[in-house]
Amino acid sequence: MTANIPVITIDGPGGAGKGTLCKAMAEALGWHLLDSGAIYRVLALAALHHHVDVESEEALVPLAAHLDVRFISTDGTLEVVLEGEDVSGEIRTQEVANAASKVAAFPRVREALLRRQRAFRELPGLIADGRDMGTVVFPDAPVKIFLDASADERAHRRMRQLQEKGFDVNFERLLSEIKERDDRDRNRAVAPLVPAADALVLDSTELNIEQVIEKALQYAREKLAVA
């Protein structure tokens, strides 16, 4: 039964460091990895590719139900494949991120993608990265972590990432977009962004990634009694 397969959920807002933490934990434990945020981004990108209105739940549901998405882990990086095409870079644009937050707010869209996310639960275990992994998708997960950081710190991190890729970034605009997205995610009617009652809340604002990984792995191993 899949219920016997352990899951570590890592929830939190964008820019808190969830992706880096999940890859490090998956590598350390030798577990599978699910980037649930990527699924919503892939759906948003598919909608943009197929000219489907990202604000129309009716139009998005059939697209979500037949979404052709795969995750391929290669040399420590996660390749996201949509309809046979590597879209790992394309789904990380701010346009797609904003669209993903909109499509994720629709109840029927979330339901259409729920089964697909749960299907990633395979032995020896799963690291699930998202916003409602511990509250909705895997409520029975034995280890739940909510990774947070201030909006200002997350905006600075995102700005550095984009600048390293050669993009010209306006910090105030980026901060405003992050705050708007936070407000939308935390206050939506369906699966709002909140820590699970039994989650460890880990604030990464003043921590470097190595410290975050160390704290998260220590907590997970204590909960799972994994050597």
Swiss-Prot record:
Residues noted as binding ATP in the record, renumbered to the chain: 12-20
Keyword Cytoplasm found: yes
GO terms (BP aspect): nucleobase-containing small molecule interconversion; pyrimidine nucleotide metabolic process
Domain of life: Bacteria
EC number: 2.7.4.25
CDD domains per the UniProt record, alphabetical: CMPK
Major localization class: cytoplasm
Signal sequence region: none
Record's catalysed reaction(s): CMP + ATP = CDP + ADP; dCMP + ATP = dCDP + ADP
Name assigned to this protein: Cytidylate kinase
Lineage summary: Bacteria, Pseudomonadati, Pseudomonadota, Gammaproteobacteria, Enterobacterales
Keywords: ATP-binding, Cytoplasm, Kinase, Nucleotide-binding, Transferase
Enzyme class: transferase
Membership in a protein family: Belongs to the cytidylate kinase family. Type 1 subfamily.
Any one annotated GO CC term: cytosol
Name of encoding gene: cmk
Localization per Swiss-Prot or TrEMBL: Cytoplasm
GO molecular function: ATP binding; CMP kinase activity; dCMP kinase activity
UniProt keyword annotation of Transferase present: yes
Transmembrane segments: none
